[in-house]
């Protein structure tokens, strides 16, 4: 697979304007990225501009804290799909996971997967906030709930992707599930290290620089 197809070309800053999003979309077309990842209010715009290409539209749910209710996340997912999203990057409820409320976490992921109607679901586990044991649990629950990917980070917390986390996530989910590294990946070398450790998708706001 060519390098560009690993990349979710991402712009999730709250101050991003329509002009910024359109630039992101044009870059994704030019460099043939896997997807653009945008906030939910921009999904329709992305869909309209990408529907005749093979660049997917990715959006986020429960972002960035993961602390909204399951019902809210399900509704967000349904609206995103109606607006044209191909891929859903959801944030788990980190606090529920750390409280040992395993069924809550697992059921929530399952409900998002059901609401996604066979669209790709990536589960953001926010590795920087978790212990190693919690990372393993989050990955295991994501796999059991039928998600397609586990993802390291929102990029809005205290840290991003680390090679050792990617390695642990890959070992936990096995070879048939996707692993997405996101947060703090700024060079091609960093990207290649993530891929070597098991990442099958890269979330980055500097996608153009990574493939130039």
UniProtKB/Swiss-Prot annotation:
Pfam families reported for this sequence: DeoC
HAMAP family with a match to the protein in the record: DeoC_type1
Subcellular location(s) per record: Cytoplasm
Documented EC number(s): 4.1.2.4
SUPFAM superfamilies recorded: Aldolase
Family: Belongs to the DeoC/FbaB aldolase family. DeoC type 1 subfamily.
Record's keyword terms, sorted: Cytoplasm, Lyase, Schiff base
Name listed for the protein in its UniProt record: Deoxyribose-phosphate aldolase
Sequence intervals crossing the membrane: none
Organism: Clostridium botulinum (strain Okra / Type B1)
Chief subcellular location: cytoplasm
GO molecular function list: deoxyribose-phosphate aldolase activity
One CC-aspect GO term: cytoplasm
Pathway annotation from the record: Carbohydrate degradation; 2-deoxy-D-ribose 1-phosphate degradation; D-glyceraldehyde 3-phosphate and acetaldehyde from 2-deoxy-alpha-D-ribose 1-phosphate: step 2/2
Known catalytic reactions: 2-deoxy-D-ribose 5-phosphate = D-glyceraldehyde 3-phosphate + acetaldehyde
SMART domains, A to Z: DeoC
GO biological process, one term: 2-deoxyribose 1-phosphate catabolic process
Function field: Catalyzes a reversible aldol reaction between acetaldehyde and D-glyceraldehyde 3-phosphate to generate 2-deoxy-D-ribose 5-phosphate.
Gene: deoC
Active site: 89, 151, 180
């Amino acid at each position: 697979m060519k390098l560009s197809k690993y990349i979710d070309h991402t712009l999730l800053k709250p101050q991003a304007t329509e002009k910024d999003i359109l630039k992101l979309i044009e870059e994704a077309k030019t460099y043939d990225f896997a997807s653009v990842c945008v906030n939910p209010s921009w999904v329709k715009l992305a869909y309209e501009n990408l529907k005749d290409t093979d660049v997917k539209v990715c959006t986020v749910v429960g972002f960035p804290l993961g602390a909204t209710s399951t019902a809210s996340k399900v509704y967000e997912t349904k609206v995103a799909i109606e607006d044209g999203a191909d891929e859903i990057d959801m944030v788990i409820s980190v606090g529920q996971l750390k409280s040992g409320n395993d069924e809550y976490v697992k059921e929530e992921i399952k409900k998002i997967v059901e609401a996604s109607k066979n669209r790709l679901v990536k589960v953001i586990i926010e590795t920087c906030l978790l212990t190693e044991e919690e990372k393993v649990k989050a990955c295991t629950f994501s796999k059991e709930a039928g998600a397609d990917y586990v993802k390291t980070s929102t990029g809005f917390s205290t840290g991003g992707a680390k090679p050792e986390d990617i390695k642990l996530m890959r070992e936990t989910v096995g070879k048939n599930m996707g692993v997405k590294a996101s947060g703090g990946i700024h060079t091609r070398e960093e990207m290649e290290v993530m891929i070597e450790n098991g990442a099958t998708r890269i979330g980055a706001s500097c996608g153009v620089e990574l493939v130039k």
